[in-house]
């Protein structure tokens, strides 16, 4: 939830063509909705891409946006990923200030979150963490007292639980 507004995760299967991302994102911006997270990547189907869009919006406007998305020629299919029926993950790279006295404590915290150290320097550690947005927020809260120098986060990616994929026939 974001400010009491429901958060929705949409998986959108699209043709892998120039301009599709701009057309899809403009549908949200024209209606004044901020996309909280956006991830786009290849799929198991040649010439198709998958967009995972996270947006905070009430159900009724979301239904309108979904109808408009379905009218776009390059949009093949849209699925709302319900929290109970999907697996969602995000990736974060976090650079934390670390010296000889704090390095051990930071590594201990990183291990608790099943994250890993991917770069070490005399003054910092770079950590790779994957998980739900809530897990990553919790890790950031733990690391904050040490001094976070830099964060790079991917968008949320999500797939339905079970054997069927977004491209599966009905």
From Swiss-Prot:
CDD domains: ACT_AHAS. It is an enzyme of class 2 (transferase). GO terms for biological process: isoleucine biosynthetic process; L-valine biosynthetic process. Residues 9-83 form the ACT domain. PROSITE patterns: ACT (PS51671). Keywords: Amino-acid biosynthesis, Branched-chain amino acid biosynthesis, Isopeptide bond, Transferase, Ubl conjugation. GO terms for molecular function: acetolactate synthase activity; acetolactate synthase regulator activity. Gene3D superfamilies: 3.30.70.260, ACT-like. Chain A, domain 2. Its EC number is 2.2.1.6. There is a cross-link at residue 46 (Isoglutamyl lysine isopeptide (Lys-Gln) (interchain with Q-Cter in protein Pup)). It comes from the Bacteria. It catalyses: 2 pyruvate + H(+) = (2S)-2-acetolactate + CO2. One of its GO terms (cellular component) is cytosol. Pathway: Amino-acid biosynthesis; L-isoleucine biosynthesis; L-isoleucine from 2-oxobutanoate: step 1/4; Amino-acid biosynthesis; L-valine biosynthesis; L-valine from pyruvate: step 1/4. Dimer of large and small chains. Belongs to the acetolactate synthase small subunit family. This is Acetolactate synthase small subunit. The gene is ilvH.
